Amino acid sequence: MTDKSKEGGSSKLLYCSFCGKSQHEVRKLIAGPSVYICDECVDLCNDIIREEIKDVLPKKESAALPTPRKIREHLDDYVIGQEHAKKVLAVAVYNHYKRLRNGDTTSEGVELGKSNILLIGPTGSGKTLLAETLARLLDVPFTMADATTLTEAGYVGEDVENIIQKLLQKCDYDVAKAERGIVYIDEIDKISRKSENPSITRDVSGEGVQQALLKLIEGTVASVPPQGGRKHPQQEFLQVDTSKILFICGGAFAGLDKVIEQRVATGTGIGFGADVRSKDNSKTLSELFTQVEPEDLVKYGLIPEFIGRLPVTATLTELDEAALIQILCEPKNALTKQYAALFELENVDLEFREDALKAIAAKAMKRKTGARGLRSILEAVLLETMYELPSMEEVSKVVIDESVINGESAPLLIYSANESQAAGAE
């Protein structure tokens, strides 16, 4: 190796042994035994190694795909109830990733299609949580998009391609990683067209968005600007194959129960052959959702082509009071456990009495916000205590009972000196 160092008085001008740049042309020059390497060459080496690893990773991952039963068990740890939806999701997700890891065709040459998922359920029933938990279990990139912000290309709002850009951002613009990701599009029911008949006026945030999403969900090669695309317009666009991305669309579909009820209630036949139904034979929202058919979704405002791209439909049930109590204390990241952990950082125990849990669940049921409303109730109840506690000394325990939830009294503070008093500051 030729020595490119030059004597300059008492100091020696050093050069990178790999690219030949001097120490003044680079930010850092690392010295080894008679060898030097600059920071730019180190970055280049890292890129080369990363590319090598990327080619090896898919082979390693193929052995790690959990079975539908294992996926369901993992969902049970975080999501209460929704047994049918969990089973449907577990099978659909397993089949999707099995298809990716074994190629799109079988040994007999049979092409395997993609099964995207439609989640139908009332607000706060766990649609988003199910999608997030699946992505975390499979260790794949996950992004959420709000369908209400999407518009057709050329109009004010987000283009559908922005969804893929968000997914790329989650995995540092690694295209191969993004192509194995999961995209959850929330509020999908809000882009339904206003009537069953095609409109002659432009519907840029309804049917127009459904049309724009068609190819993306089914599978296309989307051109996405690279990181800092506007700063470096000369860079080539990244090509992302969306046929490998799993799309999960979710929505509350308010009013869909009326559409289903109307179809189910329509009796067939006349005379003795008529299907007679009692007026009192009314069904719950959850029972009606389980009877949903593609024709109901078309009547609701989704175009037939869009419904066809979402062949797997999972319906979620309304959460009753017992389920809300379970959600408060049973999952691994249950809200009561989260707040107990927060209080533990102050060296204080937090206890929720049984009657308090029932009162919280009853309050959430009245608000009709499902599990989503539980956190806001707890925040309001614990606000004063969390405000005062860091400034107080010798508090060892905080007890919450029904009267605290109903606003009739303040939380009970138990001091390490075995004294107890109400937390209300008079």
UniProtKB/Swiss-Prot annotation:
Matching entries from InterPro entries are given as: AAA+_ATPase, ATP-dep_Clp_protease_ClpX, ATPase_AAA_core, Clp_ATPase_C, Clp_protease_ATP-bd_su_ClpX, ClpX_bact, P-loop_NTPase, Znf_CppX_C4
One Gene Ontology term, aspect cellular component: HslUV protease complex
Annotated residues for binding of ATP: 122-129
A single Gene Ontology biological process assigned to it is:
proteolysis involved in protein catabolic process
- The positions annotated for binding Zn(2+) are 16, 19, 38, 41
Q: What does this protein do?
A: ATP-dependent specificity component of the Clp protease. It directs the protease to specific substrates. Can perform chaperone functions in the absence of ClpP.
Protein name per UniProt: ATP-dependent Clp protease ATP-binding subunit ClpX
Q: Which organism is it from?
A: Vibrio cholerae serotype O1 (strain ATCC 39315 / El Tor Inaba N16961)
Gene behind this protein: clpX
